Each structure stands twice: as C-alpha cells, then as structure tokens.
Amino acid sequence: MEQNTDSMVPLPDPSQATKLTSWKNELSLQALKADLDAAKPSHTAMMIKVKEWNDLMRIEGKAKPPKVKGRSQVQPKLVRRQAEWRYSALTEPFLGSNKLFKVTPVTWEDVQGARQNELVLNYQFRTKLNRVSFIDNYVRSVVDDGTGIVRVGWNREIRKEKQEVPVFSLFPIQTQEQADALQQALQLRTDNPRGYEENVDEAIKESVRFFDETGQATYAVQTGTTTTEVEVPLANHPTVEMLNPENIIIDPSCQGDINKAMFAIVSFETCKADLLKEKDRYHNLNKIDWQSSAPVNEPDHATTTPQEFQISDPMRKRVVAYEYWGFWDIEGNGVLEPIVATWIGSTLIRLEKNPYPDGKLPFVLIPYMPVKRDMYGEPDAELLGDNQAVLGAVMRGMIDLLGRSANGQRGMPKGMLDALNSRRYREGEDYEYNPTQNPAQMIIEHKFPELPQSALTMATLQNQEAESLTGVKAFAGGVTGESYGDVAAGIRGVLDAASKREMAILRRLAKGMSEIGNKIIAMNAVFLAEHEVVRITNEEFVTIKREDLKGNFDLEVDISTAEVDNQKSQDLGFMLQTIGPNVDQQITLNILAEIADLKRMPKLAHDLRTWQPQPDPVQEQLKQLAVEKAQLENEELRSKIRLNDAQAQKAMAERDNKNLDYLEQESGTKHARDLEKMKAQSQGNQQLEITKALTKPRKEGELPPNLSAAIGYNALTNGEDTGIQSVSERDIAAEANPAYSLGSSQFDPTRDPALNPGIRLGN
C-alpha cells in the first residue's frame, strides 16, 4: 500500500476550497457531517441486527458452533435453505414476462402518454438495464437483509465529434408552389409529426424553423455544408442499483416513511479518473487528500475490496466519497429545497440542487416483513434463529453419537488365537482356534448405534416449525394438511396459506418496483433524448417523443405466481367449455390468447390475437348471393309499398270526387253548370249561323241579311238587358259610359237602341 513518505509536502487545505454556489445560505461541510454523526448511533444499532441475520444465514460469528476437540461442528443452514426456496419463487414473477410495467392514465388526456411511457419503461428494463441481475439482487437483498434499498439514477455519456451539416440561404417566397409547400409542411407537422420528421426535405424544415422564429414565409436553398462539433450520446438511460444497507444512513426521525426523511447519506467508492469525467459536477479535486480517503481508512464504509489490496496509480486509486441528499433552507426564506452534496475526506466537491425532476430522495426502501413504525423490515432469520440453533444441536449430537462409535472394528479375547493363527485370521486365510473359545461368540463386530427416536422427532419438529413460520413448503415434509385432516380441503387450505404469504411479500416487492418506475418516468420526461426508437416486436419499432411522456399516470407492476397463473388458466379453460362454440370466434381467440400469456407463450398469444380466418370462396359467394337476394326482396317490398300508397291515394281521390259530386247535386251547382254549358253551346251555334250568313255568297236578286234584326234577336235570346230602351236614355248614359257615345272609340253598336230595334221589343 502506498504511503505518504514525504512529510515536508503540506496536505491540501480544505478551507481554501472554492465556493460552489451562489446561495444566500450555502451549506458548510460541518453542517452536513453533523447530520451524519447524529444518525450514526441508530444506524449502527440496525446494522448490528442485519449482521446477526447474515451470520445466521452464513453460519458465521455467533451463529457458528464453537470448536470442541473430538466433537462435531456441523450446523445445518436452516435459514439459508428457507431463503433459497424463497428466491426463485419471488424472482420468477418479475422475470416471467417481457412486460414488467403497466401504465394507466389518470385522465383521458394522458391516454397516449401512458402508452408511450409503458413502451419506454419496459424497453429500458429489457435492453438498457440488466434486468435479471437487478431482480436477483433485488430479491436476495430483501430476503437476506430484511430491507432492500434501491438507488435510482441516470447515466449520460456523450462524445463530441465533428459532422458536416448543410448550410441554407433563405429567400422570400416568389411562387405559389413554394407557398403551398410551406403550408403543407406546417400542416403535416401538426397532423403527423412523425411523418414530418421522416419524409420532409431538410430545406423545407429550415423554412419551417425560420417561420416559427420570425413569422416570415421564406424558402430555403442549400448553398453548401459546414463542419460543426455535435454531441453524440453514447449512453442515456436510467440506472438502478441495490445498495449495501451499511453504506446508507437515513434520517432516523422519518417515522418509518422515507418520503418524510430530511436527508439520506450514501458512501461509495470512486477514483480521480471517474471524477474528472464529470468536470461540470465535481470541483475542488486538487484539495483532496487522496491517500487518507482510501477504503481502509474509512471503517464505517463496507467494502468488498480486500484490505491488503490497493492500487498505487493516483488516477485509479480508490477513495470513499459521501453523497448527501436532503432538504435545506438555502435562500434563508424558510423554504426547504432539495439539494445534493458530495465530499471526500474534508473537501466538499459538489453542492447543487437536486437534479431529479420529482425533487425527492432518489432511494426506494422495500421491507420483507414490515415492522410497525419502522422503515426497516425483518427477514426470516429473525424467526428461524432458535430453530436453527436447536436443529444444529440435535444434529451435532447425532453425529457425535455415530462418529464416536468403533464402527467396523472387531474385538476378541486375548489367547483365543496364537500368533500364527492370528496372522492367518488378519490375512483372510484359514486358521485354527481354541476349541474352548468359539469365534462366533468371542469375536465382537462393532456397529453404529441406533439413533434415538426422540432426536429424529426433534429434528423433524424443527423443520416443520421453520416451514410453518416462513410458509415455505419443502419436498421433505414440513407444512402439511394433517391438522386439517387428510382431505383435499385441508391440503388446499395449507397451500392457500403459503401462497397468500408469498403473495403478500410479492405485493411489497411490486410496490417497490412501482416506485422505481415512477421515478424513472419522471426522469424520462426530462433527461431522455428528443426522440427515442423503441422495439415493440422483432419487426415493429416505434419512435417516442420526449414531449409525449409528460402527464399523470398510475403505474402497476405485472406480477403473478405460478399457482395464480395456473388457477387463472384453469378458470379461462372452464369458461371456454361453458360458452361452447356458439359465441363469436374472436372472443374464443382472445380467451385462448390470455391462456397463452399465462403459460408464458408470447408468440402463440400474438398469433392468436392477430389471426384472421381465410374465407372460403364458395361460402363467400353464397354469402354475396344471399345479400343480393335480400336486397332484391327489399326492393320488391319497397315497390309493393309504393303501389299500395298509389292505390290509397287513388281511392282517396275517388272518395273526394264522389263527395264533391254529391254536394254539387244537392246545391244545384251541377244543374246550373249544365245550363251554362247548354247556353254557351246555343250562343256558339247562333254566332256560327250568323257568321255563315255573312260569309255565304248571295245569288243575284237576293236581299242582304238583316244583321240588326239578327243581333237584336241574339240579344233577346241571350237575355241581355242594358236598361236603355230609347235614344234619349242612350244619350244620358253616354255621359257616364263612352260605350253609348257615337263619337267614342269605345262605342258598342250592340247597345244602341237606334241600331237595334229588338232591344225595345224585350219590354
């Protein structure tokens, strides 16, 4: 190990460290260490219990039997055996499916965001994190220590490299086509952002960006390229780490709820090279005493590094750093704000606000068996310590009983065989013996003594009690249904009790995973890349936008035990038998897909959900003909309806005509109308005869027709009565009616009594 041999070189002075923040009430290292020193006693008391539990599992320390010469030191690992049975039962529900998290929206506005978060979260646990290793450590830490402590963080590694990017020149839009292209791009970005990013030309994207900034419509033309330095992310994903409970000290005044803790302090090992990678985060590295901060000089830090091993290279030399997460009034306004600080030795190298978006401590505690009003839980070792000690004592007694016996040895009296025959006896040859001493009676064969039945019963009782305490059912006896009777109901009661105990532990583990998922969701919405490509299946990929991950969500962890899955599959199978073949085929396929999911057959489940039956051409043609037949029958029915409507209208019209005819006959209207027709016919005949007389050629010597007499006669027969009987009356009427005035253009000769003597004949 490297030593500081040059005593003339002064150590760095931590008091000369650079101020790290602009806070009004910047914290001092002494204030942070005061919290550490105040919480150490309660933390040490808890770690003593954890060490006792681990000693019981590993048979170390006080749990290891003392050495006694000639006596057995065997100690059965009862606690370890029960834990080994528990590991696989608790890890399989988390690893049995590729889909670990299920995200549901709180409001309808978060539906799309919930689906995106579910895709990203499950994708990260499948590809970015070693899910198998984490779940194994997660379960083993909880089962062994009674409490699992998970630290959630974010890993971002970038590399700067030079790339050629296009250079554009912007010009005012001159044609309608350019304006339409810009308008279509703006509309596509709103309707289909993914299609916009994938299909739109970079020049149009540049025009859109300029339009967003200035509001001016332009079109871009690439004029060349330029080399610029861009950041290429090498890693950008969340991290989850199982912490050693000895290396994290939590506020003991949190009343069993870590969310109420005012601080949590973690010690971890690092080196100068790791700190230099993050120059923007860590400062004052030149003030650190790297030699005195090695793990061997930090007794409160638990490490797996051997004490005799230490790297001499100053850049790789391991040192212990303390990271403080808590809440302080940094502005002096009475408001506690989340902060994080890191120090090595006596030098504060980091002090800033909590960078995580939820503003909480980045730790999740998962108890195995909860203890009232305590944030730490208890493992099975707390229950099995006495049973393991008793079982070990009984087992050592039985082994000592067998080991101290002279098994396989023979004894005989002295003088039974002489020297020659004794040698023959030992070499397996025929020998002679003294006839007074029968070898069958004199030679004694030593064997193992019979084990006392009480010892075997005691060992069996300890195993049964251990399995009853933990609820773990082993192959070799243990928890049985004999106390309930050797019937199916009794056995089912025992299995149900064990499965309920196991499910209760699983729920606590699932709750811890849910809290981890919630913290990662909050980080994804801030730290994730603008676009993230997520693999859904072997052929399907989805691009997730960081903006879509914001919202309020409920997160569930999809877990189930083999017993529960088997029971569900049996229930679904019984449901299929109940509904029979008379239900829609799609419902049957969905139920079969659920059964395939429960049996861990994702490919079969996917095939069942996406299967579409291929139609039979003959059946399809018959269906089409049946549809056409139904359409024709429908048209025929419509035509009959139209015919019935027309006949009904005709009947109504005939009824109206009959009613009208009846009314006209009763009122004399029809008779009067007939008279009018006859009168009009006679007048027409008269006028026809007069016209014929006027147009008929006269023979020589015939007199002309008397038109006045004919007109007068027509007037008499037509019943015309003007009321004017003489010339004097005509002159008086001419003053009011120009039809009686001889000089008027409206003069009517048929009304003049002088021209129509027949007018006077009527009276």
From Swiss-Prot:
InterPro entries: SU10_portal. Forms the portal vertex of the capsid. This portal plays critical roles in head assembly, genome packaging, neck/tail attachment, and genome ejection. The portal protein multimerizes as a single ring-shaped homododecamer arranged around a central channel. The keyword Lyase does not apply. Homododecamer. Keywords: Late protein, Viral capsid assembly, Viral genome ejection through host cell envelope, Viral genome packaging, Viral penetration into host cytoplasm, Viral release from host cell, Viral short tail ejection system, Virion, Virus entry into host cell. Residues 668-679 have a biased composition (Basic and acidic residues). GO terms for cellular component: virion component. This is Probable portal protein. Residues 680-689 have a biased composition (Polar residues). It holds the Pfam family SU10_portal. It is found in: Virion. Residues 668-706, 729-763 are annotated as: Disordered. One of its GO terms (biological process) is symbiont genome ejection through host cell envelope, short tail mechanism.
